[in-house]
Amino acid sequence: MEQQKIRNFSIIAHIDHGKSTLSDRLIERSIGFEKRLLQAQMLDTMAIERERGITIKLNAVQLKMAQGNQQYLFHLVDTPGHVDFTYEVSRSLAACEGVLLLVDATQGIQAQTISNTYLALENNLEIIPVINKVDMESADVEKTKQAFHQLLGVDPNTIPLVSAKTGLGIDQLITTIIEKVPPPKGDESKPLKALLFDSYYDPYKGVVCFIRIFEGSLKLNDKIRFARSNSVYQIVELGIKNPFFEKQDVLKAGEIGWFSAGIKKLRDVTVGDTIVHAEDTTTPPLPGYKKVLPMIYCGLYPIDNNDYQNLKMAMEKIILSDVALEYEYETSQALGFGVRCGFLGLLHMDVIKERLEREYNLKLISAPPSVRYKVLLTNGEELELDNPSLLPERSRIKSISEPFVRVYIDLPDHYLGTVIDLCQNFRGQYEKLEEIDIDRKRLVYLMPLGEIIYSFFDKLKSITKGYASLNYEFDQYQVSQLAKVEIMLNKQKVDALSFIAHHDFAFQRAKKFCVKLKELIPKHLFEIPIQATIGSKVIARETIKAVRKDVTAKLYGGDVTRKKKLLEKQKEGKKRLKAIGSVELPQELFSHLLKDED
């Protein structure tokens, strides 16, 4: 199809504002799509996405649309809405000319909506504001229109109003997309230049790559070269998604599609790479693709050490479709061989762990997450550590700096006081208060990332009944009074349970930690002391009592000395067992430790 009839666009929005449902309605309106094949969340292909009702992976689909007697080609990229997956949004925007900025009329513009707007503006994309859920009783359409007017300066009367659930206003939206999203500008006659914006591993085809052709064209059997790895492959299969995989012989400038080339070396494929023809050595790579840096770090260890090689293989495959994931191999004294991973947030961590367990049949234990600290030693040397157990002795440390993030919290007026108290309790530094509209405010705080990753978000949702939304961005490192708290079980240090806490909150955190461990670790045949220490000083302690076996049950009548003898023998046995016995940790221990009870 000629380029003037192609429209490449993404749908971006806050979580739960209806992106996937709107995608379903657009797919439903496309030419040639059979309605019997439609299912809810059509573009959410992972089981975990359907169960949680959220989008995790971006997904691109080609749709043929009719407008009057003209046919158009839409390339729609559905994107996640959660703050942890912002990098997926930035990847999809690199392949588009326009975006639909979708807002739920019952909730208004949220913190993540504004963050996504800035992403679109940075990429110089045409932004089409769209108001969804206008048919609901609680919808405040006029207020949302005014909020869009303040944010983007658009005429409130030109904003499309839709209900993705019922299909209201979808036809008008299609017309708006055709009129406002500019067609791609690529030249088919120029040498091939394509952006690799996503990939995944197929056990039969090898690596399957999703690309946007910016210049030239790509044909079946063409030889291609990856600009970064310099690897050369021959195209085996080529095609589009509509939303099912469909093979084609050629992809032209402006189009979005996929290819497989029998790629088995996973390291050859890097999302964000530029693809050119094999003989082309002069075409420069496409600019502007940013590498995303992890925010939190966590160790993953297989319960069965024999699964370690399977875990290594699984990590190589999963990183193909998740460029934000970083990992390196490590060994824990308590948990054995594993990988230390860098994630963008707690949801990202949960999703990766769940995918590893489901897709690769692994049983994993995850250590408590931490952030990356900068440590200045007394000899002037600087270290960067993301594993608390590697922190040097206190006598060698001059200062420890921790990452601070700028937090944006959008909330209704009447929760303002309680949220300010919450931020102060999490060592927040107040910056400013902004007015969004008559009854909504935006709080801006500087906060330590190490505090946010524990229970801040859950507590925020709890005290605001779910009405607050949160977004954050890295600001800077600040020197803080921090200490390493080590946990000892049965007088043995468990390195995977170490954590770093602020001096003012170390005792409180350590006490809670010990109490939780007491609840979560099952009773053994011997008594287990749980101790939290800073250096050589014990700051908190709990004890798990031994399981009592009634050794006198088989006695009847007779001499009391026989009973005493059996009890003494049991006592000696427990002492011996305590000296050599190891404490078994349940698999779900670490995830439960993260959930703050109060």
Swiss-Prot record:
Primary location class: membrane
Top EC class of this enzyme: hydrolase
Name of a matching Pfam family: LepA_C
Matching InterPro entries: EF-4, EFG_III/V, EFG_V-like, EFTu-like_2, G_TR_CS, LepA_C_sf, LepA_CTD, LepA_IV
Subcellular localization, as worded in the UniProt entry: Cell membrane
UniProt membrane topology term: Peripheral membrane protein
Cysteine pairings via disulfide bonds: none
Keyword Hydrolase assigned: yes
EC number(s) from the headed UniProt entry: 3.6.5.n1
One GO term describing the cellular component: plasma membrane
GO MF annotation list: GTP binding; GTPase activity; ribosome binding; translation elongation factor activity
GO BP annotations, alphabetical order: positive regulation of translation
Domain of life: Bacteria
Residue ranges constituting the tr-type G domain according to the UniProt record: 4-185
CDD domains: EF4_II, EF4_III, LepA, lepA_C
Binding site for GTP: 16-21, 132-135
UniProt KW keywords: Cell membrane, GTP-binding, Hydrolase, Membrane, Nucleotide-binding, Protein biosynthesis
Catalysed reaction, written as an equation: GTP + H2O = GDP + phosphate + H(+)
General function of this protein: Required for accurate and efficient protein synthesis under certain stress conditions. May act as a fidelity factor of the translation reaction, by catalyzing a one-codon backward translocation of tRNAs on improperly translocated ribosomes. Back-translocation proceeds from a post-translocation (POST) complex to a pre-translocation (PRE) complex, thus giving elongation factor G a second chance to translocate the tRNAs correctly. Binds to ribosomes in a GTP-dependent manner.
Family listed: Belongs to the TRAFAC class translation factor GTPase superfamily. Classic translation factor GTPase family. LepA subfamily.
Protein name listed in UniProt: Elongation factor 4
Species assigned in the record: Mycoplasma pneumoniae (strain ATCC 29342 / M129 / Subtype 1) (Mycoplasmoides pneumoniae)
